């Protein structure tokens, strides 16, 4: 709309403003009252006012509402509610919104996995959740994959005991039941329960130990003043052009470290095969296969977008909000560029 003076006439002007109609627009920072122009001829209505909230936005508002209605809010929570523009916290309205969001997230969580998935990353984040009148850190585990076309996809997510082999077996079996197949390499941290579950459920897949987590574990056994030197030694292993050369360099580094840092040398020797598993795959993929960093970035994004909640009222609200965020990210990946090029994927088949 052009804001011409009332008496101005121009050749481009095909109609005239004839007052306004008021419309409330609910935003994350509150409700804004808009004055939408009425026309003498024709109609005008801004299309962006008709756009529904994105799933993660709806889920965030819902979690805040649910916490508030359940009586677990604090002064800070009340402030957040006001900033989100939430008014009229009616329990039946919250219940209806919760049901709709649950169905949407559950459908995504249980959808069929119809493409072969070559690489899988597994990791967890630990947000705070109310449980039996206590506040506990609850594991929210995520499985990220790269399918046969080179695109990333969210394979699944769940709340559970991330240190338990039984939990991981159940989680991985649920992925297989939905169609997960063709897995050649799984990348994760060295949780014993997880390693055993991978061997049991994804039989035939290799396991890559996260290089970043391994480095932290090794350096924990090295005096502060020597950490950078030891890290530099270890990095020379990963700079080698192939698996054979990396193995030879690892042996040399172990010999160098053993006299002064025997525990670090021992850990490095024991981890050789799991630490260098990624080098059996296309070189163009090495950087992303050597660690859990692709999933760590995803976890940071979830943390960033859920930090306003701070404490989830229950497990369901955690799954609802984190699941909605993952849905949005997965949709963006589906239409975005490939994570690995089609050409670089060809040697795997």
Over which residues does each language-model region extend?
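Alpha-helix N-cap/N′ positions at the starts of helices
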Residues: 56-60, 229
């Amino acid at each position: 709309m052009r804001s011409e003076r009332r008496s101005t006439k121009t050749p481009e002007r095909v109609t005239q403003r004839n007052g306004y109609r008021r419309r409330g627009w609910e935003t994350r920072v509150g409700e804004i009252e808009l004055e939408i122009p009425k026309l003498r001829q024709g109609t005008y209505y801004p299309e962006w006012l008709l756009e529904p909230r994105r799933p993660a936005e709806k889920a965030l508002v819902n979690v805040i509402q649910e916490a508030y209605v359940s009586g677990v809010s604090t002064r800070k929570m009340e402030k957040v509610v006001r900033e989100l523009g939430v008014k009229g916290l009616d329990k039946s309205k919250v219940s209806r919104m919760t049901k709709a969001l649950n169905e949407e997230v559950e459908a995504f969580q249980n959808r069929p996995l119809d493409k072969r998935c070559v690489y899988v990353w597994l990791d967890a984040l630990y947000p705070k959740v109310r449980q039996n009148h206590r506040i506990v850190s609850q594991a929210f585990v995520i499985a990220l994959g790269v399918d046969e076309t080179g695109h990333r996809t969210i394979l699944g997510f769940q709340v559970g005991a991330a240190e338990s082999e039984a939990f991981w077996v159940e989680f991985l079996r649920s992925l297989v039941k939905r169609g997960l197949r063709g897995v050649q390499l799984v990348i994760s941290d060295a949780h014993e329960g997880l390693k055993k579950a991978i061997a049991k459920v994804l039989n035939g897949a290799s396991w890559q130990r996260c290089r970043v987590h391994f480095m932290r574990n090794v350096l924990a056994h090295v005096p502060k003043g020597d950490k950078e030197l030891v890290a530099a030694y270890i990095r020379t292993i990963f700079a080698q052009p192939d698996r054979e050369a990396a193995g030879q360099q690892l042996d040399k580094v172990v010999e160098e470290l053993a006299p002064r840092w025997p525990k670090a040398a021992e850990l490095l020797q024991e981890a050789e095969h799991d630490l260098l598993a990624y080098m059996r795959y296309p070189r163009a993929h090495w950087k992303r296969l050597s660690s859990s960093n692709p999933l760590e970035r995803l976890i940071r994004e979830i943390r960033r977008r859920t930090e306003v909640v701070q404490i989830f009222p229950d497990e369901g609200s955690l799954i609802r909000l984190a699941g909605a965020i993952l849905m949005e990210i997965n949709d963006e990946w589906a239409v975005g560029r490939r994570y690995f090029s089609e050409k670089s994927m060809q040697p795997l088949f």
